[in-house]
Amino acid sequence: MSKSLDADVRRLLDAPNFAALSTLMPDGSPKVEPIWVGREGDHILIATDRRGVKGKNLELDKRVALSITDFGNPYEQALIRGRVIETRDDNELVILDRLSHQYLSKPFPRRKWSTRVVYVVEADVARYYKSPLEHTPA
């Protein structure tokens, strides 16, 4: 059952905030890594190399979990559980360049790819949380 993303979750996805992506390894153990994320409507976009561990994991098991933390306030976050519903080739780096502009303000610098893909994720659960705590490290 897909979940519409509320305005706060969309805002965190649309800003240059890193997400922690959790996928499942072939043996069932979790793998977590920081990634860039994009959005199309209520879908989350994950750009990667199909041959990498992340791509291989997503080909084997479509389930994902994402934690997106606000870059300026680590006590503001979105938590998403969902699944890959579509895989798109992105060898021309159209989506990756869009994400790169979001995070680096320029096209993606490494241009030689032959197995770039974008995984389109549909959220089954999407929650937004903002703590009243203030981030004031010593």
Question: Language model features by range: what are they?
Answer:
Residues 1-18, 138:
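Extreme N-terminal tail/first-helix region
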Residues 2-4, 75-138:
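Charged, gly/pro-rich active-site loop segments
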Residues 10-11, 36, 56, 108-111:
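Short secondary-structure boundary/capping segments
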Residues 16-50, 58, 64-68, 79-80:
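Short beta-strand segments
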Residues 27-29, 70-74, 112-113:
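A short beta-turn/loop motif at secondary-structure boundaries
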Residues 53:
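Short alpha-helical
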